[in-house]
Amino acid sequence: MKILLLGCLAMPALAGLHAQDLHFSQWFNSPLTTNPANTGFIPDADYRLGANYRNQWSSIMSEPYKTMSIFGDAQVFRNRIQSGWLGLGGVIMHDVAGSGNLTTTEVYGSIAYHQMLGYSSLLTAGFNTGWVNKRINSANLKFPDQFDGKFFDNQLPTSVVLDQPNVNFLDMQVGMNYAYFPNEKTYFNAGFSVQHINQPRESFFIANPAGFDSHISPRYIAFFNASFKRSDLVILNPMAYYTNQAGAYEAVVGLNAQYNISGDGDEQLIGGLYYRVGDAFIPMVGFVYHNIRLVFTYDVTTSSLSNYNGNRGAWEFALIQNGFYNQYNGDRHQSLCPSFRQ
């Protein structure tokens, strides 16, 4: 019954292809997909490398949704631009959704300019553009006219014909960031971005079916995070995230804490809890070892979908490494946000 219900819900989406944008619960650990102005916005390092993986709905689907990404960004021309620098980076995302094997591959390049405003604030503007490919294996799909009264049978003939099961398009994003750090124990950061500013067309049909617009609506993203060093052992990080696209929205609020277990800040424990409004609680655990951070989250479903998945929504991990170009950079005191390292 679960599979039948999900199949019926999925079929109308094929016509308009208004698919949900790829996303992670750990939006803060996927900086370049959240806001292109995050490119090179690395408060405590010169460069950053990362990987994300998300597995969703494995409790109710034989083929769960799987999303993965790798990214990297760096600060450049830091010593050549007065009180500013450029950020350059890129991200590759890959997603496989459901039994129809709807596969999405995205490759983006990002650039951002960061300008200090005095000694305690920073303003950033960023832009990215990239190539997106979507393809689908229609042999694994079942359509309404293949329902025999009891079951869907994909061996039955269907009137649905996909004109182009493989589509490509160009996508663009813009964003801004502002950070305020009045002292070594306090840090605030807020950003706003607009994705799909060129509103590319995304459809497996050459002509739009009646009543459908296959252009991707702009997606608006706003976020806020802060960092407060409470002692030499504890740093608190409250965060909030909001996105809206074509009337669909997502809001996440929460808090995590870093606990210094080594004294010098090289080893830290991370724990936190987030809430996606109307959908899920998201507990988080993680560990920092020198410049490597590993974070795991689990979406505990609280919406009506919990009747089908038993509260088991998705699990996700992020692996991030921060680094410096040389030992001198690592020794300098350049962190803009609270740190255990002196």
Predicted regions and their residues:
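Short, Lys/Arg-enriched, disordered terminal segments
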Residues: 1-4, 342
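Sec/Tat signal peptide C-region and signal peptidase I cleavage site
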Residues: 14-19
